[in-house]
A protein has these predicted regions:
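Single conserved hydrophobic/aromatic residue that forms the stacking wall/gate
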Residues: 1-7, 11
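Short, flexible active-site loops
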Residues: 12-22, 63-76
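A short, structured beta-strand-centered segment in the mid-to-C-terminal lobe
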Residues: 23-27
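Active-site "cap" helix and flanking loop/linker of ATP-utilizing ligase/carboxylase catalytic domains
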Residues: 29-50, 55-56, 65-113
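A general structural signal for well-ordered alpha-helical segments in protein cores
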Residues: 32, 61, 84, 138-141
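Short acidic-glycine loop/turn motifs at beta-strand connectors
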Residues: 54-58, 148-150
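Peripheral (often C-terminal) accessory segments that flank ATP-dependent C-N-forming ligase machineries
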Residues: 89-167
Length: 167
């Protein structure tokens, strides 16, 4: 199996708001061990997303999603091969692509509405993904992915996008 970098997630009103891909997470190896055992037991093909909570220095599984997952959308621009492409490769029996990170990456969800598109796309290192869904309070209607050369730049870009989201 291949594993993507762990991501640290921030939730607002129980909905994923921000996901930051970690370069080196101290619990990455433990997470890969847990996930690997599940994949082997199920003889699983495709993308399987796990959400863990850090508890007392260990991990507790909260969600297992047998599909591409919102928390992995950062891979679209932030990995050599995105979760979407690797899912298609897996189910088609093709060789999997590298999940290696490209730079420092994050994803911010647009909930209920999409900020001014011109302002979002004017932010350096920012990529807009609009789902074309009807706007509804709390509904995921799009997201921005960020890919930067370093963590300081990433944090600055996150603040810029978040300011647009907050209005």
């Amino acid at each position: 199996p291949l594993y993507s970098s762990a991501a640290s997630d921030v939730y607002k009103r129980q909905v994923l708001a921000l996901s930051i891909a970690s370069t080196e997470h101290p619990l990455q190896a433990l997470a890969e061990d847990y996930v690997g055992r599940v994949l082997t037991k199920l003889d699983y093909v495709g993308v399987l997303a796990f959400e863990f909570f850090e508890v007392d220095g260990g991990l507790k599984a909260n969600e297992i999603a047998p599909r591409v997952h919102n928390s992995g959308h950062w891979t679209i621009e932030g990995a050599e091969c995105s979760q979407f492409e690797n899912h298609l490769r897996a189910v088609a029996g093709l060789p999997l692509g590298s999940t290696a990170k490209v730079g420092e990456s994050a994803m911010l969800n647009f909930l209920g509405s999409v900020p001014d598109v011109a302002k979002v796309t004017a932010i350096a290192d920012c990529h807009l993904h609009h789902y074309g869904k009807a706007f509804k309070a709390g509904r995921k209607v799009g997201h921005a992915t960020l890919r930067c050369a370093d963590m300081a730049s990433l944090k600055a870009r996150i603040a810029e996008v978040d300011a647009l989201i907050q209005g």
